[in-house]
UniProtKB/Swiss-Prot annotation:
PANTHER family reported for this sequence: 23S RRNA (GUANOSINE-2'-O-)-METHYLTRANSFERASE RLMB
Taxonomic placement: Bacteria, Pseudomonadati, Pseudomonadota, Gammaproteobacteria, Legionellales
Gene transcribed to yield this protein: rlmB
CDD domains documented for this protein: SpoU-like_RlmB (cd18103)
Record keywords: Cytoplasm, Methyltransferase, rRNA processing, S-adenosyl-L-methionine, Transferase
Chain residues that bind S-adenosyl-L-methionine: 198, 218, 227
HAMAP family: 23SrRNA_methyltr_B (MF_01887)
UniProt protein name: 23S rRNA (guanosine-2'-O-)-methyltransferase RlmB
Organism this protein belongs to: Coxiella burnetii (strain RSA 493 / Nine Mile phase I)
EC class: transferase
Pfam families, A to Z: SpoU_methylase, SpoU_sub_bind
Family membership noted in the UniProt record: Belongs to the class IV-like SAM-binding methyltransferase superfamily. RNA methyltransferase TrmH family. RlmB subfamily.
Length: 250
């Protein structure tokens, strides 16, 4: 029997309704809340056959002590994906693969933001270690604004071994490091690529860094020496998109 997990917030619930409405067991909505976005979600849920239950704000607060925006959904948990899912994803590719590897990101807000950027820029899968890293939590789902439901999130036992396997499959591994001598825009990102970002504060682990085919830095002009991992994620993924959509030289 599938485990049930609560998610909350308009964007998170909307993402599940769009991607996998069959996962929603019950939808709890704050009664008499004047919010057109909420009403639209309720109408959509009912049209999809989802059971909607009206509760007072006090009752809803007992289901979630986070900022729920008047809506909480009991959902069947997504099946955990592991290394075996990567092979299937890569075999199905018709265009150059783009993967995102997060080496030990622990903050759920950062993971949620990275998932949102990953979905926006067409990342095929986000890969993270099972240990010493955050998984997909209700906070992650809320920050991701539905992207957690649409972007495969694969947790692996041994990140170094996974990187080795990806390289054998023809994927180039591009790590980010403040000490790198090469700028991200100087690397050809038009082929099968995995962008690797390190944890908050510590950056890439030594073993991960040693396995990268390239190390790149994001050019900074101010006094700060590094960026938040989710900000760096968006910049790197945009650069991949920029290169891939650039006109071919005449």
């Amino acid at each position: 029997m599938s485990k049930i997990k609560s998610i909350y917030g308009i964007h998170a619930v909307s993402g599940v309704l769009d991607a996998a409405p069959q996962r929603i067991v019950k939808l709890y909505v704050q009664e008499n809340r004047d919010d057109q976005r909420l009403q639209s979600l309720v109408e959509k849920a009912k049209a999809l056959g989802v059971k909607v239950i009206l509760l007072s704000r006090t009752e809803l607060n007992t289901l979630s002590n986070e900022k729920h925006q008047g809506i909480v959904a009991d959902c069947e948990e997504v099946e955990n994906l592991d290394e075996s899912a990567l092979l299937s994803l890569l075999k199905k590719r018709e265009t150059p693969a783009l993967l995102l590897i997060l080496d030990g990101v622990k903050d759920p807000h950062n993971l949620g933001a990275c998932l949102r950027s990953a979905n926006a820029f067409g990342v095929r899968a986000v890969i993270a270690p099972k240990d010493r890293a955050v998984g997909v939590t209700p906070v992650v789902r809320k920050v991701a604004c539905g992207a957690a439901e649409m972007t495969p999130f694969i947790r692996v036992t041994n990140l170094s071994r996974t990187i080795d396997w990806l390289q054998k499959e023809g994927v180039w591994i591009v790590g980010t490091a403040v000490e790198a001598e090469t700028l991200i825009q100087e690397i050809d990102l038009t082929g099968d690529i995995a962008i690797v970002l390190g944890s908050e504060g510590a950056g890439l682990r030594r073993l991960t860094k040693e396995r990268c085919d390239f190390l790149a830095q994001i050019p900074l002009r101010g006094s700060v020496e590094s960026l938040n991992v989710s900000v760096a994620c968006g910049i790197c993924l945009y650069e991949v998109q920029r290169q891939r959509e650039a006109p071919a030289p005449s």
